[in-house]
C-alpha cells in the first residue's frame, strides 16, 4: 500500500516548524486502491535477508470456508508517508476495553441480512481531503471507530480482526487513526484509540467502523517503543476498512519501516484473512518478509492484502516467528 511522495507534500512539510523531523518520517502509510494486482504481476519478499520476487498466480478465488465473507483478487495497496510539522500532544480514546477475552468458534460468520452491529462505536466523521491527506472516519470522539468486542459478539460487526497473543510473553497492542486528534498526519505520535494487553496465548477481538484508516503497533511488555520524535517505532499492522475514497475496498499490510528507521527491534507479525490467505508477514528480526513493508521496499507499490467491498475478517498473529 505505497503512494509516492508528491511535491505538494514536500512543500507542505518544508513549511513546517521542524523540517528535521522529516528524517525517518518521509514515508508513512496510507492506502489507495488505484491498481489491482492481477495474475502475472510481480510480488516482492525478503527471505533470509535476500530480496526476491515472483509472479503472482493468485486469481482471487477464495478457498471454500464456513464464513460467508467475500474474497477478491489482491490489489495494489497504496502507502504513503508524511512527517508531522510539530509534535502533537498524545491522545487516548477508550484506552483499555473491558471486553472478555477468549476464542470464538464462529466469529468469522456475518449477519444473514447484512445488518451489522455498531454498538460501542461513537459518531462518524465525514470524509474530507484527498490523496495522502484524506481523512476518513476517525470517530466522534476521536478513536471511537476502533473498539474491542467480546468473542461472542465479534460476528455481529462488519470489520473484525482476531489478535492472537505471543506463545510466551505478555504483549501490548496500540491502535490509532492515520489522522491524529489534531487533524494532521500524526496519529502514531503517542496517540491511542484503543490499547490491548494480551497475556501469553490470549486471544482478543477488535472491530473497526466503516471508512477507517490507520494502524496498530505491537510489542512485548506494557508499552510500545518510540523514536526520538515520539512516534511508535515497532512493527505495525496497517488497515483501510470500507474506504469511501477507494470505492469500499479494504486492505492491510505489515510494516517494519518505522522500527528499522529508528534502529529498534523488528517484532514479528502475520496478518491474513480468516481463510489463511492474502497474508502479509514479517517474522522476528526480518528473517522472513512476505508481501510486507521494510525500509528497502518503502518505495514499492502493490504490497499487502486487499478485498472487495464487504465484511472483513482478519487473523493477526503477534510475535510471529518462522
Swiss-Prot record:
Positions of the UniProt region annotated as Disordered: 80-109
Mark out the compositionally biased spans (Low complexity): 80-105
Q: Name one GO molecular function term.
A: IgE binding
Q: What is its main location?
A: secreted
Q: What's any one GO cellular component for it?
A: extracellular region
UniProt-listed InterPro entries = Allergen_Asp_f_4
Q: Which UniProt keywords apply?
A: Allergen, Secreted, Signal
What single Pfam family name could you report for this chain, choosing any that match?
A: Allergen_Asp_f_4
Q: Does the keyword Signal apply?
A: yes
Q: Where in the cell is it found?
A: Secreted
Question: Is Secreted set as a keyword in this record?
Answer: yes
Residue span of the signal peptide, if any?
1-20
Q: What is this protein called?
A: Allergen Asp f 4
Source organism: Aspergillus fumigatus (strain ATCC MYA-4609 / CBS 101355 / FGSC A1100 / Af293)
Amino acid at each position: 500500500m505505497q503512494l509516492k511522495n508528491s511535491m505538494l507534500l514536500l512543500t507542505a512539510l518544508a513549511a513546517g516548524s521542524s523540517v528535521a523531523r522529516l528524517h525517518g518520517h518521509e514515508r508513512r502509510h496510507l492506502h489507495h486502491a488505484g491498481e489491482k494486482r492481477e495474475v502475472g504481476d510481480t510480488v516482492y519478499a525478503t527471505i533470509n535477508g535476500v530480496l526476491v520476487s515472483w509472479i503472482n498466480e493468485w486469481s482471487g478465488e477464495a478457498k471454500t470456508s464456513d464464513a460467508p465473507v467475500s474474497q477478491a483478487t489482491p490489489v495494489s495497496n497504496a502507502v504513503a508517508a508524511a512527517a508531522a510539522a510539530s509534535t502533537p500532544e498524545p491522545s487516548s480514546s477508550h484506552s483499555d476495553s473491558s471486553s472478555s477475552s477468549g476464542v470464538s468458534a464462529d466469529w468469522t460468520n456475518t449477519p444473514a441480512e447484512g445488518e451489522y452491529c455498531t454498538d460501542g462505536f461513537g459518531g462518524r466523521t465525514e470524509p474530507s481531503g484527498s490523496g495522502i491527506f484524506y481523512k476518513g472516519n476517525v470517530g466522534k470522539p476521536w478513536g471511537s471507530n476502533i473498539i474491542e468486542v467480546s468473542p461472542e459478539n465479534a460476528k455481529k460487526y462488519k470489520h473484525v480482526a482476531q489478535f492472537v497473543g505471543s506463545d510466551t510473553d505478555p504483549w501490548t497492542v496500540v491502535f490509532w487513526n492515520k489522522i491524529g486528534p489534531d487533524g494532521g498526519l500524526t496519529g502514531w505520535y503517542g496517540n491511542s484509540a484503543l490499547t490491548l494487553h494480551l497475556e501469553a496465548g490470549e486471544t482478543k477481538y477488535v472491530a473497526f467502523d466503516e471508512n477507517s484508516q490507520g494502524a496498530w503497533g505491537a510489542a512485548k511488555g506494557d508499552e510500545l517503543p518510540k523514536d526520538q520524535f515520539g512516534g511508535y517505532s515497532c512493527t505495525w499492522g496497517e488497515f483501510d476498512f470500507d474506504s469511501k475514497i477507494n470505492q469500499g475496498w479494504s486492505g492491510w499490510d505489515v510494516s517494519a519501516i518505522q522500527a528499522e528507521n529508528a534502529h529498534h527491534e523488528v517484532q514479528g507479525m502475520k496478518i491474513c484473512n480468516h481463510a489463511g490467505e492474502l497474508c502479509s508477514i514479517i517474522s522476528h528480526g526480518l528473517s522472513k518478509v512476505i508481501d510486507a513493508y521494510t525500509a528497502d521496499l518503502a518505495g514499492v507499490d502493490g504490497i499487502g492484502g486487499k478485498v472487495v467491498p464487504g465484511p472483513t475478517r482478519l487473523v493477526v498473529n503477534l510475535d510471529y516467528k518462522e
